[in-house]
Amino acid sequence: MSCIFAFSKDRPPALIHDGYSETIDRKALQSYLRGACLLDPFYSACVNGHAEGLWRMRDLAPDAFYESEFAWSSEVHPCISDQAGTLIEEIGYIVPLGLGEAATFSLMRNRNSSPFSVEEFTNLEVLAPIVSASIQQHYNAINTARGGGKQHRSNADAVFSKAFGELTQAQYAVTKLILSGHSNISIASILEIAEGTVKMHRYNIYKRLNISSQAELFQLFIEQLTD
């Protein structure tokens, strides 16, 4: 399977190539576009100016990403909703589009296949300049239909804010990192605070939201996507 998304902090995500199989749950895809994409390592890479080229998701993902609810959720992760089951690997080309926007061209294999070998990855990596130029040309051709260079505030952050807007600024930042798949140690490093402070924030987040687990935290987010 394959897909191409255009991501920006200031515009809604756009699916500009739909190479998903017919078994993909379209509701999961809509939930992904409405806001779950915020938790995708490729989204984070695109909106934070990551180096272009071909990347394995595991090299972009936070340290606890594959233990996170998003990584295995059939409700918001289109690939996991496929009848073939859990992804075995995802790789993707990151392509800068200008004006703070970038595209990711994802190539995916499910558990009925094997991961991309070193040789396969190397061969695909050689094609990166051609892929990048082709996507940039295609995007420029369709960009006018999306409003050109105009800024349209993404609803993805609005959905996240709706779910967790009652939290303090510090708690909000920690919540976003938790759901993105960062461990307490990783969060402490990113926010430059002590690990014990992260644990205290997590405790207060759960208490304020009247929940007791990370799974419940994720479910609160999901409920906003399906409203």
Language model region names:
Residues 172-173, 216:
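Pre-recognition alpha-helix immediately N-terminal to the DNA-recognition helix
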Residues 109-124:
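Regulatory loop-to-helix N-cap segments in sensory/regulatory domains
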Residues 125-132:
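Allosteric cytosolic regulatory segments
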Residues 214-226:
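Short, basic, alpha-helical segments at the C-terminal edge of helix-turn-helix-like DNA-binding modules
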Residues 1-98, 107-110, 129:
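Regulatory input/activation interfaces that engage signals or partners
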Residues 144-170:
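Regulatory hinge/linker segments at domain boundaries
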Residues 181-216:
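Recognition helix of helix-turn-helix DNA-binding domains
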Residues 178-182, 221:
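Short helix-to-turn junction characteristic of helix-turn-helix DNA-binding domains
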